[in-house]
Structures are given as C-alpha cells and as structure tokens.
Amino acid sequence: STAFISQYIRLLYPAILNYTNGVMITDIDMLPMNNTYYSKHIEDYDNNKFIYLRDVLIHTDNQIAMCYNVATSKTWQDIFHIHSIQDINTSLINRFKSIDFVEGTSNSCWFTDQIELYNHVQSWNERTHNFVYLNDKITGYSRLDRIHMNTHTLDETLKTKIKSGVFSDYHCLRPYSQYKNMNDMIYHTL
C-alpha cells in the first residue's frame, strides 16, 4: 500500500540520513508558518533528546502525532533499530503484514504510524530518559486550520496574522487540486 508506506517510512528514513543536527518529521499537508516555533523551543536541548513539539494525543490516545518530532539520525536509529535501506524495507514489509491496513482515514490502522512512534519512543525512553514533549500553551502553538476558514478568500486581517507569524502552521485544504489557489495564496503570503 502506497498510503501505508508514505505514512510509516517517515519513522524509519530519518535514521539513515547523514545529518548531525535534528531531523524533523511532519505530514505532507502541513505548512510551517513561522520559524521561531520550530527552533526557539528546542535550542536548549542537547542532541540526545527526542523532542515532540506538541502535547496532543500522548495522554489521551497513546499516540505521538507525526507533527512535529525532531531528533538526530542517531537517535532515530536507536529508537527504530534502522541502519540501512534494507532495514527500512524489512520493517515496512513486516509491519504491513502484521496489520489489516485499508486505504482511507476511517480504518483503525490509519494511525499505525502514530501508535508505533509512541510505543517505540516510550520503550526507548525507559532506557535513556531522553524523551521531551513540549506544552502547546507554553510554546504558543497556533494552527491556521482548514476546518475554520473561508475556502475562497483571504481577508486582510488573516494576511496580517500570517505575515506576522501568529500561526505555527497551516493545515492545507485538500484535495490540493481543488484548493490550489487558496493554498498557494496562503503560501505566497508567508
């Protein structure tokens, strides 16, 4: 399943990147909207930490949302035991065979990646005590959400908020082909 692979590979691929600083994962339909949110709140942590920039789902659903997690490649390796492309392939195949994944967000397996991230990070944290999650109220997290917006116009007040970095991210309207103009307008307002 291409949907399963595109979701699950985000957990594994950071482990094989040749990069010394943090690698952040997210969703493809999320648009970062201010650079302070993604850097300011993590700069005091050392490179041994796995940092979850949100505090949603962790206490209610035993999940860690894909947005936004940052750790070094070495930490991703340690959490998921991934050291090569072959390890990624093997992990993808084994995990896919162990679930009843059906395309679409209504299937319970849709959240396999977030549940797996939670379980692996919790297990790793028992050994290392290096898991950090940040509080949305303290970080000032604020999403421009597609659910609460006019899908045809971008008023001046909203443009001003976007330009001044009020929002941490934008959850893009989809499908992109239908909402291309609005998504592009928001992107170009940044």
Q: How should these model regions be labeled?
A:
Residues 75-190:
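Catalytic core and acceptor-binding pocket of nucleotide-sugar-dependent glycosyltransferases
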Residues 46-74:
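Short beta-strand-to-loop element that shapes/binds the nucleotide-sugar donor at the catalytic cleft/hinge
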Residues 6-54:
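GT-A fold catalytic core of metal-dependent nucleotide-sugar glycosyltransferases
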Residues 6-10, 62, 113-117:
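Catalytic-loop motifs flanking and including active-site residues across diverse enzymes
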